[in-house]
Design a protein with these regions (language model features):
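C-terminal, well-structured catalytic/ligand-binding subdomain of enzymes
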Residues: 23-124, 147, 155-393
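Long, hydrophobic, well-ordered secondary-structure blocks that form the structural core
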Residues: 140, 153-154
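Short arginine-rich
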Residues: 141-148
Length: 393
């Protein structure tokens, strides 16, 4: 693939420098077990309290895609108008190094590439999940980060894959049904034995995966998994009365659920985006039709509101029910608008469908921002420190 050689050493070095270490929880819900019949890809991002931002970009081929990440540059979550979604989790430190480490004549930083840059390449160059897997395997086996393992999910409306990769190694597995959950340990046979993670660390990661699976199952409707259940699960956190680990942690940065539409991916694929700790912000339905995010999303002031609330109120706080009630209102509203847009698209009325979706987003965005600002003001006026966030999570 000639496109693989077009990445510059400078871009690779920049991405590798900017990408922080993290401890994330992600899952894929296969279309065969989702209530909507669509693929769901969820990522909960943890790191070092760096705010998430988002923007809309165009590939060199003119394909529109949404980037959610950090520093207004790196992509940690992404979805394109082709209905292709990708996310990445940090995995284990490995017992191996990149083959070029032993070659002093090679500038090592310029021969490696971070997953955040691979994400950008996926959005720029790939139309399907299968193509994305081939690209990831290429980088994993040739140019990936030194000594560090990663796990990536890629999915389109029809197929989904999990990929474990490390320096000189990469393995892929197709998700053909059910749900698959990843935290921060590698899983696939070709690379998992190379892990340097202690048994206690692996046990903790697998505990988080098992707990997420249990909680998602509890929230099924008629035996099927829903976006609402995914959002609720993403907000669960470790507490003394609940054994094990959960997705919402002391260093949570936010979450996103991609719902991939097979019929009209460029219009009806949806990103449910929460910037800031999941308990302290709104999951906002965002259609693929928007041309750009509002400035509060890009400049991180939206996420900053959530961070301030988490610092004042702690977790399981007094405003959480109000946030959940707001989502109970806007999620069905959006679903209704999306189905109205679907009928317009079937009738060949693309302009009207796009306007309907974008107007809904603008209205719900304004309502959500107003709510978060009201909560922020109330929290400042009447501070009430919530439950202390446990140091271990």
């Amino acid at each position: 693939m000639n496109c693989l050689e077009k990445i510059t050493a400078a871009a690779a070095l920049t991405a590798a420098t900017l990408l922080p270490s993290a401890a994330c929880t992600s899952w894929i819900i296969h279309k065969s077990v989702s209530a909507s019949g669509r693929m769901l890809v969820q990522k909960c991002r943890d790191s070092h309290r760096r705010p998430l931002d988002a923007d809309v970009r165009r590939s060199r081929h003119g394909v529109k895609w949404m980037r959610i990440g950090m520093f207004k540059h790196c992509a940690l979550f992404a979805v394109s108008e082709r209905g292709l979604a990708a996310i990445m989790n940090d995995g284990d430190d490995l017992t191996v190094q990149h083959p070029n480490v032993a070659r002093p004549e090679i500038n090592h930083a310029h021969s490696s590439i971070a997953c955040a840059e691979i994400m950008r390449q996926i959005m720029d160059e790939c139309a399907t999940a299968e193509q994305a897997v081939k690209l990831i395997l290429h980088y994993g086996r040739n140019k990936t980060q030194v000594g560090r393992g990663q796990t990536m999910f890629v999915a389109d409306p029809r197929r989904a894959f999990m990929v474990d990769l490390g320096p000189g190694y990469a393995e892929a597995k197709e998700v053909t049904g059910g749900i698959i959950i990843i935290t921060n340990c590698l899983h696939l046979p070709g690379i998992e034995p190379l892990s340097r993670k202690a048994v206690t660390g692996v046990r903790s990661d697998r505990s988080r995966e098992a707990n997420v699976r249990t909680e998602l199952k509890k929230r099924r409707v008629n035996g099927k998994y829903t976006v609402k259940g995914t959002i609720e699960t993403s907000r669960l956190r470790c507490r003394k009365e609940i054994q094990g680990k959960y997705p919402c942690r002391r260093n949570s940065l936010g979450g996103t659920c991609f719902e991939l539409d097979p019929e009209f991916p460029a219009q009806l694929t949806t990103a449910y985006i929460a910037l800031g700790p999941q308990q302290h912000t709104v999951y906002l339905p965002t259609p693929m039709t928007i041309e750009q995010f509002p400035k509060e999303i890009f400049d991180t002031s939206w996420a900053d509101l959530a961070y301030k609330l988490s610092e004042r109120e702690g977790y399981d706080h007094r405003f959480l029910a109000r946030i959940a009630a707001f989502e109970e209102k806007i999620l069905p509203e959006y679903e209704q608008v999306r189905e109205e847009a679907r009928q317009l698209l079937k009738a060949g009325k693309k302009t009207e469908a796009v306007k309907l979706l974008n107007d809904c987003y603008a209205r719900q965005y304004a309502e959500a921002l107003k709510l978060l600002k009201e909560i922020d003001a109330e929290s400042v006026k009447d501070p009430l420190k919530g439950e202390k966030i446990p140091a271990e999570v």
